Regions:
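Conserved catalytic breakage-reunion loop centered on the nucleophilic residue
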Residues: 1-180
Length: 180
Protein backbone atom coordinates (compact mmCIF):
# COMPACT_ATOMS: atom_id res chain seq x y z
CA UNK A 1 0.00 0.00 0.00
CA UNK A 2 1.14 3.54 -0.52
CA UNK A 3 0.38 6.84 1.12
CA UNK A 4 0.43 10.19 -0.69
CA UNK A 5 2.75 12.82 0.78
CA UNK A 6 3.17 16.45 -0.18
CA UNK A 7 5.46 19.22 0.99
CA UNK A 8 6.24 22.79 -0.02
CA UNK A 9 9.71 23.40 -1.46
CA UNK A 10 11.88 26.46 -0.77
CA UNK A 11 10.64 28.14 -3.96
CA UNK A 12 6.98 27.62 -2.98
CA UNK A 13 6.17 24.67 -5.23
CA UNK A 14 4.23 21.70 -3.93
CA UNK A 15 6.25 18.50 -4.13
CA UNK A 16 4.22 15.29 -4.15
CA UNK A 17 5.59 11.87 -3.33
CA UNK A 18 4.40 8.42 -2.41
CA UNK A 19 5.35 6.57 0.75
CA UNK A 20 5.14 2.79 0.76
CA UNK A 21 3.08 1.58 3.68
CA UNK A 22 3.59 -1.75 5.43
CA UNK A 23 1.01 -4.52 5.13
CA UNK A 24 1.78 -6.96 7.99
CA UNK A 25 0.81 -10.16 6.10
CA UNK A 26 2.93 -9.17 3.09
CA UNK A 27 5.90 -8.24 5.28
CA UNK A 28 5.75 -11.64 6.96
CA UNK A 29 5.52 -13.39 3.60
CA UNK A 30 8.56 -11.51 2.26
CA UNK A 31 10.51 -12.45 5.41
CA UNK A 32 9.46 -16.08 4.95
CA UNK A 33 10.55 -16.11 1.30
CA UNK A 34 13.98 -14.71 2.18
CA UNK A 35 14.36 -17.07 5.15
CA UNK A 36 13.43 -20.21 3.20
CA UNK A 37 15.66 -19.25 0.27
CA UNK A 38 18.63 -18.53 2.58
CA UNK A 39 18.09 -21.92 4.22
CA UNK A 40 17.63 -23.94 1.02
CA UNK A 41 19.57 -21.90 -1.55
CA UNK A 42 16.97 -22.99 -4.10
CA UNK A 43 14.17 -21.18 -5.91
CA UNK A 44 12.46 -24.54 -6.57
CA UNK A 45 12.56 -25.54 -2.90
CA UNK A 46 11.32 -22.10 -1.88
CA UNK A 47 8.50 -22.46 -4.41
CA UNK A 48 7.71 -25.93 -3.03
CA UNK A 49 7.66 -24.59 0.56
CA UNK A 50 5.24 -21.80 -0.40
CA UNK A 51 3.00 -24.29 -2.21
CA UNK A 52 2.98 -26.72 0.74
CA UNK A 53 2.17 -23.89 3.16
CA UNK A 54 -0.56 -22.51 0.88
CA UNK A 55 1.15 -19.13 0.50
CA UNK A 56 -0.24 -17.21 -2.46
CA UNK A 57 0.35 -13.88 -4.16
CA UNK A 58 -1.82 -10.89 -3.31
CA UNK A 59 -3.92 -11.85 -6.35
CA UNK A 60 -4.52 -15.32 -4.90
CA UNK A 61 -2.25 -17.15 -7.37
CA UNK A 62 0.49 -19.65 -6.65
CA UNK A 63 4.00 -18.25 -6.65
CA UNK A 64 6.30 -19.05 -9.55
CA UNK A 65 10.08 -19.25 -9.37
CA UNK A 66 10.12 -16.12 -11.52
CA UNK A 67 7.95 -14.23 -8.99
CA UNK A 68 10.05 -15.48 -6.08
CA UNK A 69 13.23 -14.34 -7.83
CA UNK A 70 11.58 -10.95 -8.43
CA UNK A 71 10.92 -10.56 -4.71
CA UNK A 72 14.42 -11.72 -3.74
CA UNK A 73 16.10 -9.27 -6.13
CA UNK A 74 13.92 -6.24 -5.35
CA UNK A 75 15.95 -3.77 -3.29
CA UNK A 76 12.80 -2.11 -1.93
CA UNK A 77 12.81 -4.72 0.86
CA UNK A 78 16.45 -4.09 1.84
CA UNK A 79 17.13 -2.04 4.96
CA UNK A 80 19.33 0.97 4.21
CA UNK A 81 22.22 0.05 6.52
CA UNK A 82 26.04 0.03 6.32
CA UNK A 83 26.15 -3.22 4.36
CA UNK A 84 23.58 -1.94 1.86
CA UNK A 85 25.56 1.28 1.38
CA UNK A 86 28.83 -0.59 0.79
CA UNK A 87 27.20 -3.05 -1.63
CA UNK A 88 25.58 -0.28 -3.67
CA UNK A 89 28.83 1.73 -3.78
CA UNK A 90 30.87 -1.34 -4.79
CA UNK A 91 28.40 -2.00 -7.62
CA UNK A 92 28.65 1.59 -8.90
CA UNK A 93 25.01 2.39 -8.28
CA UNK A 94 24.04 6.05 -8.69
CA UNK A 95 23.17 6.99 -5.08
CA UNK A 96 20.92 9.94 -4.36
CA UNK A 97 21.35 9.66 -0.61
CA UNK A 98 23.99 10.68 1.86
CA UNK A 99 25.86 8.06 3.87
CA UNK A 100 24.07 9.24 7.03
CA UNK A 101 20.67 8.37 5.51
CA UNK A 102 21.61 4.67 5.61
CA UNK A 103 20.27 4.56 9.16
CA UNK A 104 19.47 0.86 9.49
CA UNK A 105 15.77 1.63 9.61
CA UNK A 106 14.42 2.81 6.25
CA UNK A 107 14.13 0.88 3.00
CA UNK A 108 15.67 1.42 -0.42
CA UNK A 109 13.94 2.93 -3.45
CA UNK A 110 15.45 1.95 -6.80
CA UNK A 111 14.56 3.74 -10.00
CA UNK A 112 15.46 2.89 -13.61
CA UNK A 113 15.83 -0.73 -12.49
CA UNK A 114 13.91 -2.28 -15.36
CA UNK A 115 13.78 -1.80 -19.08
CA UNK A 116 10.12 -1.83 -20.06
CA UNK A 117 9.13 -2.07 -23.71
CA UNK A 118 5.65 -2.68 -25.14
CA UNK A 119 5.14 -6.29 -26.14
CA UNK A 120 8.39 -7.42 -24.49
CA UNK A 121 9.11 -8.92 -21.09
CA UNK A 122 10.63 -6.49 -18.60
CA UNK A 123 14.39 -6.77 -18.31
CA UNK A 124 16.47 -5.94 -15.25
CA UNK A 125 19.04 -3.28 -16.10
CA UNK A 126 22.65 -3.53 -14.90
CA UNK A 127 23.06 -2.06 -11.41
CA UNK A 128 25.27 0.75 -12.74
CA UNK A 129 22.15 2.12 -14.46
CA UNK A 130 20.01 2.13 -11.30
CA UNK A 131 19.20 5.31 -9.43
CA UNK A 132 18.85 4.59 -5.71
CA UNK A 133 17.54 6.66 -2.81
CA UNK A 134 16.63 5.88 0.77
CA UNK A 135 12.85 5.68 1.09
CA UNK A 136 10.56 6.82 3.86
CA UNK A 137 9.22 3.27 4.31
CA UNK A 138 10.69 0.85 6.86
CA UNK A 139 13.08 -1.73 5.42
CA UNK A 140 12.30 -5.41 5.94
CA UNK A 141 15.44 -7.43 5.15
CA UNK A 142 18.84 -6.61 6.67
CA UNK A 143 21.34 -5.39 4.10
CA UNK A 144 23.67 -8.31 4.85
CA UNK A 145 20.90 -10.86 4.23
CA UNK A 146 19.81 -9.16 1.00
CA UNK A 147 23.40 -9.06 -0.27
CA UNK A 148 23.92 -12.72 0.69
CA UNK A 149 20.80 -13.69 -1.27
CA UNK A 150 22.08 -11.83 -4.35
CA UNK A 151 25.35 -13.81 -4.14
CA UNK A 152 23.40 -17.07 -3.81
CA UNK A 153 21.26 -16.19 -6.83
CA UNK A 154 24.39 -15.36 -8.85
CA UNK A 155 25.83 -18.80 -8.07
CA UNK A 156 22.55 -20.38 -9.21
CA UNK A 157 22.38 -18.39 -12.48
CA UNK A 158 23.90 -21.27 -14.42
CA UNK A 159 20.99 -23.47 -13.29
CA UNK A 160 18.30 -20.97 -14.27
CA UNK A 161 15.58 -22.11 -16.62
CA UNK A 162 15.96 -21.01 -20.17
CA UNK A 163 14.89 -22.79 -23.35
CA UNK A 164 15.54 -26.53 -23.14
CA UNK A 165 18.37 -27.71 -25.31
CA UNK A 166 17.71 -31.08 -26.88
CA UNK A 167 20.34 -33.31 -28.44
CA UNK A 168 17.63 -34.92 -30.55
CA UNK A 169 16.77 -31.81 -32.58
CA UNK A 170 19.82 -31.88 -34.86
CA UNK A 171 19.25 -35.57 -35.60
CA UNK A 172 15.63 -35.26 -36.66
CA UNK A 173 14.69 -34.04 -40.09
CA UNK A 174 11.75 -33.96 -42.40
CA UNK A 175 12.12 -35.39 -45.84
CA UNK A 176 9.59 -34.59 -48.51
CA UNK A 177 11.31 -36.69 -51.15
CA UNK A 178 10.54 -40.35 -51.66
CA UNK A 179 14.15 -41.36 -52.18
CA UNK A 180 15.35 -44.51 -50.48
Amino acid sequence: ASESLSSVTVDGKVKKACKLGPIPEEIQLVKTIFSVFMETGSLSKTDQYLLEHRCVTKRGKQFTRFAIRGILTNPVYMIADDTAYQYLKENNVDLFAERAEFDGEHGIMAYNRTLQRPGKANQIRPMEEWIVAVGKHPGIIAGGDWVRVQAMLDVNKSKSYRRPRSNVAPLSHCSSSNST
